[in-house]
Amino acid sequence: MAGAASPCANGCGPGAPSDAEVLHLCRSLEVGTVMTLFYSKKSQRPERKTFQVKLETRQITWSRGADKIEGAIDIREIKEIRPGKTSRDFDRYQEDPAFRPDQSHCFVILYGMEFRLKTLSLQATSEDEVNMWIKGLTWLMEDTLQAPTPLQIERWLRKQFYSVDRNREDRISAKDLKNMLSQVNYRVPNMRFLRERLTDLEQRSGDITYGQFAQLYRSLMYSAQKTMDLPFLEASTLRAGERPELCRVSLPEFQQFLLDYQGELWAVDRLQVQEFMLSFLRDPLREIEEPYFFLDEFVTFLFSKENSVWNSQLDAVCPDTMNNPLSHYWISSSHNTYLTGDQFSSESSLEAYARCLRMGCRCIELDCWDGPDGMPVIYHGHTLTTKIKFSDVLHTIKEHAFVASEYPVILSIEDHCSIAQQRNMAQYFKKVLGDTLLTKPVEISADGLPSPNQLKRKILIKHKKLAEGSAYEEVPTSMMYSENDISNSIKNGILYLEDPVNHEWYPHYFVLTSSKIYYSEETSSDQGNEDEEEPKEVSSSTELHSNEKWFHGKLGAGRDGRHIAERLLTEYCIETGAPDGSFLVRESETFVGDYTLSFWRNGKVQHCRIHSRQDAGTPKFFLTDNLVFDSLYDLITHYQQVPLRCNEFEMRLSEPVPQTNAHESKEWYHASLTRAQAEHMLMRVPRDGAFLVRKRNEPNSYAISFRAEGKIKHCRVQQEGQTVMLGNSEFDSLVDLISYYEKHPLYRKMKLRYPINEEALEKIGTAEPDYGALYEGRNPGFYVEANPMPTFKCAVKALFDYKAQREDELTFIKSAIIQNVEKQEGGWWRGDYGGKKQLWFPSNYVEEMVNPVALEPEREHLDENSPLGDLLRGVLDVPACQIAIRPEGKNNRLFVFSISMASVAHWSLDVAADSQEELQDWVKKIREVAQTADARLTEGKIMERRKKIALELSELVVYCRPVPFDEEKIGTERACYRDMSSFPETKAEKYVNKAKGKKFLQYNRLQLSRIYPKGQRLDSSNYDPLPMWICGSQLVALNFQTPDKPMQMNQALFMTGRHCGYVLQPSTMRDEAFDPFDKSSLRGLEPCAISIEVLGARHLPKNGRGIVCPFVEIEVAGAEYDSTKQKTEFVVDNGLNPVWPAKPFHFQISNPEFAFLRFVVYEEDMFSDQNFLAQATFPVKGLKTGYRAVPLKNNYSEDLELASLLIKIDIFPAKENGDLSPFSGTSLRERGSDASGQLFHGRAREGSFESRYQQPFEDFRISQEHLADHFDSRERRAPRRTRVNGDNRL
């Protein structure tokens, strides 16, 4: 979520430092200083450490001593540097007299790649030292980001190498190299693969130096991608073979490439091209009159940010476009700005305001409630979210409001305060914000809103306003009362439900409304205290070694143990290339109570006895009498850091050799169990996360059988030498694999939780197997001769939006729950949704929900509009509930009450609280609601409709005056430009559609509208903003803390103008004839066609343990009639430098002024699910053509280091000679759409789906082929300098 904010909060001096000063600063930071680090964890006290800047890698590092680096941050990730004690890390020690540093001696570094930034809070020894660090780091931040790509690669290579070569010996082992390449997403099949390539580099044995590593990297990158169809590559490769350094791209050749292929008009000037090449290479030895690229450097340029598909000229703010009324702009807007996570238990933070403002957000929300001492607090009312002071928020806004943008900021006030506290709010607005607060109109006689230029550096208040002449009065609110809004709940919080399998209690979020109790799926109980550190249980020191991978126990009797140890070490070190010092520890066969250390040195196994003795009843361990340890674990840890010394050698213990058969004693392992037997066992445990591991018949092969989403699934595990493989993830052992997936999801959200064996089945297994977990409704007969089982009726969840094409179909949105589903053949099912019963919908748009366990009587009738939204697990009707406190508690929980229902016999739900007070309050409120449900609902509606407003606060409202939306006023004299309306997304959807979209756009041409997420989005997810934008809504408020597609689209919309927060809507939208949903209403706008080939990628991020198998989805998002997506094939096991086969993708865009081109890189996992890796989204109007790099971002829209796609992109006008060609993109796509529609609508209610619809499918395929041929022919005819929006200057 990169913005354009200055890194230093309060400025960084009068000007840029001179070259001499920069040199002095860099030398000083490289030497480092001793400073005190204040931690974010309460359990850690401040410590003095040495802080240094590593210029070779552009990192800040810290350590206690000179040897071991304890931590590091990349300078490229630093977002802001603040002088003073401006973080909560200092606040934790205010009461400790030992840690009260001088304000002028402190500074804070904020860094990270997510919305919520991390802090490095430091105390220096003097104010001069603080200034040195701030000034030096500020220069380094800018210089690091602006460095040319080859220099960034050099720094990245050194960072990777030094992460292994921590002692800076300039050498690493082949095993280290193999592991390093795996970490950067490159599959090394075996050690021989590396040896062959290292031989090419004249490295025949021993360790690898940095120079050899760097050369290997360049060789791997070029050899993998030289097959791409690129200019110069084919002919040059024939001449140079595998040696790219034997062939060059000269200055004239590069100039011609820029002109002919890239359409770069600036390249007509050879001097500019020369300067560009020199600045890219930045090599003193290459500063010659005619610079050149080696072939691998040319390919590197194609993937570089310097060759971006985005036209960087659009990054600059154009003041001439800032003179329209505010209502003509899209304005970057945040919802519940103060939150850092979900809507019910996350932290409210001042940093969230600072982050949003520095990202260019221009409309932020303040949710104000009565607080102590007469001053409001800000939080999400009636939830567990933490509270922050209103006055602190104002100071934060003042400090950060105009750092990223000088254009106006709108404060959207959600006011729940009393009159007295409203008056205090008004006073503080004026006191803190001063002259920046707008208190009077810019022009008294204006007939429209002022422009961004007229409101520069002004802050506007959005709040309800009194009628003229009132001191205070009750005014109607524009919000309809809804008991499904969590802010209107009577009580909510964390309670606990017992797991029926392991009888542990897990937290769930409960909400009590005026008529129902809602509760969520399992959640975290401490989201609001993310800085708290859970104390770890420490085993007895004498047993610490038992779980270490290097401890092998008793390997055999007599000399067998010695021989087994030698075999294990020899096989492991030869196969993996493990270094000297690789070791294992085993019980001694000769001396009871002693152990043997076996290690690898110079190609042989050596053994050393570890002695033990009792000292005052406590065991002690030692190799030599003069150095004794309290435990075997301490001894081994010591010699991993300090060398073993003897007359012949000195050597540290390096790599532990893992146990090979440790899994055989585990409760989840079954040596002789068939697939059918495993399934039968799991059918008796109807809980997700139940699992077992079984040996398969194939050599070195295992299977994990588990339950997820109500179904039994299997995945194969393969032993390959010393490595255990699950998909493309590598583990040292089967035990390590299971341990990893007990902490991380194995399949979607499912973690391995309940190990299953016969003993476990006796305790928790059901008497009757759950056959529904194994057999789908489409194949109900699990015995061939049995009568068919009745069709299952289940619930499904929508994966995508779907709009009905016929009267007998359902319309639903993504995540909708469709009930009472009947699975039919032919790809179409029936179900109930939105009040419609048993209508058709496509089965591939949904996924089946987990079979509901018989805990919740209303689970099959879940309320789709509940306050918990997608987090909902169950709902209870309060008037039907009976509450009973269990004085004795239950299963180690003291504070338990039961909920039962008279209508459901023999059913109750046991719920636990954290305290007696909490239990009593819940029981009291539930009983009250049960008695007064109807009256409370009526009272709530009445109270919410009337609100008192203080005059002092009302007077601060000038332009943003919220009023109830009145459709009848649109286009009449009663419409006032100062009035605006707010809509939850559900209400907005009633206007942003074909029926009313044009009318709503007319409203937005004069007045502001604000749209915000519905209250049920407790997970802080976002809605699709595109329909709101195209209908003219200016303030489309999103949860900035959530890294989802809507926020990525938001970042793309506002990327022009340096994220200034204001984007002028296209002039088309101000045309009275324009209809957002009718492409025939477009006037004066030329449609375009885009052809894209995805050629390759570099430096894709990892997702978990394995090497990724990436594919790319290309999407055009914009007007409803333009939106479409296509995808490439996936590449197996390569995220470092994958290449895709040549395949053009074609897109037709009718409204390019409101269109985005979006690339998303996914990986396909072993379950054929797609997992997000990276994305890049651009407005179509700013795209360049030719062979272009697509710099990739993470899900928070932060730049990924060196990650990019290489594409070939051409953009054509869709019309030729003024008329549409019979084989133009438009006509072919419409013909294809017709054929697709026939295929889609003509589904079989009976009979064969395949036979009846073969012909429409064939017509669709032929149309698509014609479209591809059309693009190819146009590409051959079109000049190479095709461009969009003028000059494609870099």
Curated annotation (Swiss-Prot):
Residues at the catalytic site: 335, 380
Modified residues (Phosphotyrosine): 506, 771, 775, 783, 977, 1253
Residues that bear N-acetylalanine: 2
Domain C2, chain residue ranges per copy: 1071-1194
Entry keyword annotation includes Flavoprotein: no
Record-annotated disulphide pairs: none
GO molecular function: calcium ion binding; calcium-dependent phospholipase C activity; guanyl-nucleotide exchange factor activity; neurotrophin TRKA receptor binding; phosphatidylinositol-4,5-bisphosphate phospholipase C activity; phospholipase C activity; protein kinase binding
PTM comment text: Tyrosine phosphorylated in response to signaling via activated FLT3, KIT and PDGFRA. Tyrosine phosphorylated by activated FGFR1, FGFR2, FGFR3 and FGFR4. Tyrosine phosphorylated by activated FLT1 and KDR. Tyrosine phosphorylated by activated PDGFRB. The receptor-mediated activation of PLCG1 involves its phosphorylation by tyrosine kinases, in response to ligation of a variety of growth factor receptors and immune system receptors. For instance, SYK phosphorylates and activates PLCG1 in response to ligation of the B-cell receptor. May be dephosphorylated by PTPRJ. Ubiquitinated by CBLB in activated T-cells.
Enzyme Commission number(s) from the entry: 3.1.4.11
Regions annotated as coiled coil: none
Gene3D superfamilies according to UniProt: C2 domain, Phosphatidylinositol (PI) phosphodiesterase, Pleckstrin-homology domain (PH domain)/Phosphotyrosine-binding domain (PTB), SH2 domain, SH3 Domains
GO cellular component: cell projection; COP9 signalosome; cytoplasm; cytosol; lamellipodium; plasma membrane; ruffle; ruffle membrane
Compartments, as annotated in UniProt: Cell projection, Lamellipodium; Cell projection, Ruffle
Domain PH: 27-142, 489-523, 895-931
Top-level enzyme category: hydrolase
Keywords: Acetylation, Calcium, Cell projection, Disease variant, Host-virus interaction, Hydrolase, Lipid degradation, Lipid metabolism, Metal-binding, Phosphoprotein, Repeat, SH2 domain, SH3 domain, Transducer, Ubl conjugation
PANTHER family associated with the record: 1-PHOSPHATIDYLINOSITOL 4,5-BISPHOSPHATE PHOSPHODIESTERASE GAMMA-1 (PTHR10336:SF173), PHOSPHOINOSITIDE-SPECIFIC PHOSPHOLIPASE C FAMILY PROTEIN (PTHR10336)
Recorded domain comment: The SH3 domain mediates interaction with CLNK. The SH3 domain also mediates interaction with RALGPS1.
Protein name as it appears in the record: 1-phosphatidylinositol 4,5-bisphosphate phosphodiesterase gamma-1
Organism: Homo sapiens
